Amino acid sequence: MALRLYDTLTKEKRDFAPLDPSNVRMYVCGPTVYDFAHIGNARPVIVFDVLFRLLRHLYGPDHVKYVRNITDVDDKINDRATRDFPGLPLNEAIRKVTEQTEKQFHDDVDALGCLRPTIEPRATEHIGEMRSIIDRLVEGGFAYVAEDHVLFSPQAMNAADGILPRYGSLANRSLDEMIAGARVDVAPYKRDVTDFVLWKPSKPGEPSWPSPAGIATQGRPGWHIECSAMAWKHLGEKFDIHGGGIDLVFPHHENEVAQSCCAFHTDRMATTWMHNGFLQVEGEKMSKSLGNFLTISDQRDQWGPAVLRLNMLKTHYRQPIDWTQHNLSETGRELDRWFEFLESASGGDPNDANDVMSALADDLNTSAAITALRVQFKNKNSAALRSGLDLLGIPIGREFIQGRKHVRLYAEGAFVAAGGGTATFSTASSSVERSDIQQLIDARAAARARKDFKESDRIRDQLAAMGVVLKDGKDADGKPTTTWEIAR
């Protein structure tokens, strides 16, 4: 099966041909560990996890190398460390911030069903590679030293003869456009407004290392050089796929291309560039000032990992996504129906999931893949539905629908639809009579029996609004049962 991927550089969808099919290599920009990851950060992690799974399926698990970095040296980290741990030396405070944030990131993305990358390098472990690349760039005339800074010159890159790409080609911008749109307050040590920092001197107390290019004072790397160095160390001078969010195309990825191609005299850093679209919340840009800033951890409290992952994949990765409560609720209900079916169903042909595979092979078209899953559910092909969910990395089970706030099942409240007493239970929103809960459960059971799923879903939502969460199953005789819990 041919894999076709959209390349940001060429602006076209092309057949994917790895440089070495026995060693398929992919690099994705990872987190800067200064704050908990928000739900927008989860999008590239999930998208490229699906691609990683697909590549492993096509080429074999032992023939795919996936690198996703950890940026652990950055001004934002320094600022957070100073704010959160004012009584500690800065380096010790930085270590606390980065360790805590990295642990939370791993907890979050592991919960979302994402495989760990083959290699997860930290920037601070690759300072030597950064200095080596910078020295090459200075020696080649592509970078210069000024006031203990090392700066890259896009003008020098575009003036060079040979196979080097033009600076701005990835973002489809010309240098003239960049110069015209540049800020007026340009640092005095820059020769040109488009020059960017490869290395800078450290302030007292900040992390610092011996500088490249013969600079006597110690310093630290700029952001862009970090990824060039880590990709070179673990994937080589040229590799197959470089991914990240659309916001990274310029300047970050453009600068990576410039650094790597000029240092190693190559025409491309990666043969395919892939970028996922923006995420907004309820039709608005996510912002702390708007009060709609959603961390992955917050969303895990409210929604199960299967809901978060499937909801993310319903939109094609290159399209913008609107993250809404309504869509999450719809996704949860759909998964509930699928998982209820899978609890009791068996049989079918797993090869029927080839439609899911074909959709993924067409530029990772997860929305089409999910449409194929709906067909398998409609056809009651449990084997194909399971296989397709596995390809998408969706964990199967009712426990993966509910968020962490819905974790405790009341012992006295766990009863089948035919039972129940008259005790009153306090929920997050009201006091509820057990008999009222039972009446609604009975009405919902009747709706399900006549296959009126719209009414069944309405009653489930009504109970959820009351703070009651339902769990459907079957008894020993195979008859439907419903248990409930109070959302805490």
From Swiss-Prot:
GO molecular function: ATP binding; cysteine-tRNA ligase activity; zinc ion binding
Catalytic activity line of the entry: tRNA(Cys) + L-cysteine + ATP = L-cysteinyl-tRNA(Cys) + AMP + diphosphate
GO cellular component: cytosol
Superkingdom field: Bacteria
Listed InterPro entries: Cys-tRNA-ligase (IPR015803), Cys-tRNA/MSH_ligase (IPR024909), CysS_C (IPR056411), Rossmann-like_a/b/a_fold (IPR014729), tRNA-synt_1_cat_dom (IPR032678), tRNAsynth_Ia_anticodon-bd (IPR009080)
Keywords associated with the record: Aminoacyl-tRNA synthetase, ATP-binding, Cytoplasm, Ligase, Metal-binding, Nucleotide-binding, Protein biosynthesis, Zinc
One GO BP: cysteinyl-tRNA aminoacylation
Family as reported in the entry's similarity comment: Belongs to the class-I aminoacyl-tRNA synthetase family.
UniProt protein name: Cysteine--tRNA ligase
